[in-house]
């Protein structure tokens, strides 16, 4: 007997988008499945994980959103080994994760609408409290941390991106473009270029280091993405957008040109169902929070 799993209308629409992209140009990076994380060190199941963060020391941190906790793992030679659970009362609904240069964790809580700071051992250190001029309260939609531990906070309510140093002092403010759909993420590359992602129009805007405004980067990639919600850059300058509803990754060049898609919809290892965040390490390993499959997957990425 054949058993079919129900697919909602958004995924059906997304399949059309994925098929439309299949005839596009050759991709610049290929992803190969390496490992899958379903459980913690005590054999407990993950529940709708939305966040992942990793570093070059082999540390992987997962925001196990449905269980209101963080989980740490060690990564070595393609194997992922569970380590510890981090569960603090100051985190109710962790969704986005970043690690700073010291292994400290920064976590966006969607319910509290705050970014929490935890040390490398998981002890709560307080909430990020930015004080930009003329703004009563910063309400983060998303954020990133760069190699110098500078913080980039997207506040869609204020229609701005705030840049702060490691002490929390605001050093720059970038207004969001007025002619846009819905900004979902901010990113920064190794050269200090700041990017914002418009999910509705599937466009990326960029601001060079020291710039005071965003400019459009290339054309819309809406023909190849259904609803991109997360953006990051690899160490070769390729931008990767997580297409949440399209269950895949869209690759863009430094000029915003479309380079191709990777991964697709499904429930077996190597396939995705409503992915939310991706992190990359210097070795080329990629970790994807595969939210609706209740797992995190590890891929090796190979330049093509």
Model-assigned labels for residue ranges:
Residues 1-12:
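Bacterial N-terminal signal peptides that target proteins for export
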Residues 74-78, 119-123, 165-169, 208-212, ...:
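Short loop/turn segments that connect beta-strands within beta-propeller blades
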Residues 65-66, 110-111, 156, 199, ...:
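Short loop/turn segments immediately following the C-termini of beta-strands
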Residues 27-45:
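A short helix->beta-strand "capping" segment at the edge of beta-propeller domains
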Residues 68-70, 113-115, 159-161, 202-204, ...:
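Structural signal for beta-propeller blades
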Residues 274-304:
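Blade-level signature of beta-propeller repeat domains, shared across WD40, Kelch, NHL, RCC1
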Residues 42-56, 89-101, 133-148, 178-192, ...:
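Beta-rich, blade/repeat-based domains predominating
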Residues 59-62, 104-107, 150-153, 193-196, ...:
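Conserved beta-propeller blade signature
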